[in-house]
Regions:
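Juxtamembrane regions of bacterial inner-membrane/periplasmic proteins
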Residues: 1-255
Length: 255
């Protein structure tokens, strides 16, 4: 007599498989979307590269700007304290990015949330807007400045870019360029500025009228404190150094 083997019910698929399948489909959609976005961005960058001007004339543009506004070209080495304060505040990864800093761009919205200025635009982008976009900040100008920033980074050495930036910036009170600003505010050449003076000067870059040390000393001191905080953040100064510098007089001569 043949024994009847008990048939086992068919094994059902794990309940998690449909979930995994949905997750896999979602990943594919996301990856395809990101891939498509990357292609569009690269295409837009290629078009931007073709339609924006070359930047071999950047130094001539700086010289023309200084001549138009009565500024003075800087001489000698880039002032060490001014450069350190500027880079800590405006572009702490200068020299290690190709003219655009995606980390900085991602930090900028975070700064709005936490109530601190964490940067965003690089030195090259800011210089591009001043020299080639007449300071415009509309979306088109910002997009072009990204392409121009990469061109500037490829065409010029870091020291040249810093010098052009410091010569092109407006520091308020009719002072165009770091040479005129240092002599106008403090009666000193840029290389002889102390930390207190250099940090006040760099604080003017983003809003020279708002942080005017003559008209708004309290706001200028608050901005100086931010510059000092950034110097501490990047390791140039200790917290004790920053506190001592914040207490130093500025010795303003303009007014």
């Amino acid at each position: 007599m043949t024994a009847h083997l008990k048939q086992q019910p068919p094994t059902s698929a794990p309940a998690s498989l449909p979930r995994r399948s949905r997750a896999a489909r979602l990943r594919r959609v996301v990856l395809r979307s990101l891939g498509g976005l990357l292609v569009l961005l690269l295409a837009a960058f290629a078009v931007g590269w073709a339609v924006t001007p070359g930047v071999g004339d950047a130094e001539q543009r700086v010289a023309a700007r200084l001549a138009a506004f009565g500024g003075t070209p800087s001489t000698g080495q880039v002032p060490e304290r001014v450069a350190a304060a500027l880079l800590a505040t405006e572009d702490s990864r200068f020299g290690s990015h190709p003219g655009i800093d995606w980390r900085g761009a991602l930090r900028a919205p975070l700064g709005v949330v936490v109530g601190r200025d964490l940067g965003g635009s690089t030195i090259q982008q800011q210089l591009a807007r001043v020299l080639y976009e007449d300071g415009a900040i509309d979306p088109g100008a910002r997009a072009r400045s990204v392409v121009l920033a990469v061109k500037l980074d490829r065409a010029w050495r870091d020291e040249q870019l810093l010098r052009m930036y410091l010569d092109a910036v407006y520091f308020g009170h009719g002072f165009y360029g770091v040479q005129a600003a240092a002599e106008g505010y403090f009666g000193l050449p840029p290389a002889e500025l102390g930390w207190a003076q250099a940090t006040v000067l760099v604080g003017l870059v983003q809003a020279p009228s708002a942080y005017d040390p003559l008209a708004h000393p309290e706001l200028a001191a608050a901005r100086q404190a931010h510059v000092l905080d950034r110097l501490v953040d990047v390791g140039t100064l200790t917290r004790a150094d920053a506190g001592a510098i914040a207490a130093e007089p500025w010795h303003l001569t303009a007014g």
